[in-house]
Amino acid sequence: RRNKAFAVRIGPTVVHHRWLAPTVKAAIADPGITALSQATPDETTLTGTRVLRTLDHLGWQPQAEGHGFAAGQPKFNYQLRLTDAEGAALTDEQLLKGMNQLWRRNIKKADKLGVTVTRGERADLARFHRIYLETAERDHFTGRGLPYFETMWDALNAEEPDRMRVYLAEHEGDLVAATTFIRVGTHAWYSYGASTTAKREVRGSNAIQWRMMRDARDAGADIYDLRGITEGLAADDPELGLIQFKVGTGGEAVAYLGEWDKPISSFLHFAFQQYLKRR
């Protein structure tokens, strides 16, 4: 109240449900299923269930789930395990075996066509940002400015050197894809990605993901997080292609608990919620 806040919002990083790749693929193929939450999870975690009940008991309010990506953190993510049940790192062959045929073919194609993937430096964020804006225009989303990524780089790498990286995929001297990568402990994230409209056939996006997966594993990560997906699975859903791209890696879709609000001023919180609905 001293800071004139009308609510507190949290987004617990606690996995509640998991759907393995075969389950997601079957759900996509089933015309009777239009949302991931309609498919039976392969696992519902006890911790997730307990935290959900505790939040509800303490008066926290779950945020309404809209279609597509919201302003906050995505509730549904796609993750790839980099270790086996005993905790041993997966080999390249094991990682490739978990992928679908299209992914394996595209990785091989990129290599055959001479796509090279390298790690960049801070100055290369400008090159990443150039095609990131091209991606934003093509895919109809509002991109962030270059200073945002430079600030992220400075802050994260000040905490721990090499926490944030930028990767560049090139073909015959042309930049065809670029990504940012973050690792904290044993969890690595594909943070932001970009690709050019030209030369999409050389499969730079597959090549750059393959490099990041292996680098994450070699750095000691046990999870490679491809981050957000939406839960829409209908054939005409505009985000279905994103899920199909990520599910091709193998891995699993996970649902976190979502974002929750604790109103401090019920009136102002209600007014804010109404504003968001009409925006």
Regions from the language model: what does each represent?
Residues 1-3, 216:
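Hydrophobic pocket-lining residues that define ligand/cofactor binding sites across diverse proteins
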Residues 3-4, 74:
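Residue-level preference for short coil/turn positions at secondary-structure junctions
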Residues 6-12, 38, 118-120, 168, ...:
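A structural signal for short, well-ordered beta-strand segments and their strand-loop junctions
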Residues 13-14, 124, 230, 260:
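Conserved beta-strand edge residues that scaffold enzyme active sites
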Residues 14-22, 43, 57-201, 215:
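A conserved beta-strand-loop-helix scaffold within acyl/acetyltransferase catalytic domains
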Residues 21-85, 222-279:
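Active-site/acyl-donor-binding loops of N-acyltransferases
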Residues 152-271:
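Aromatic (often tryptophan-rich) hydrophobic motifs at membrane interfaces
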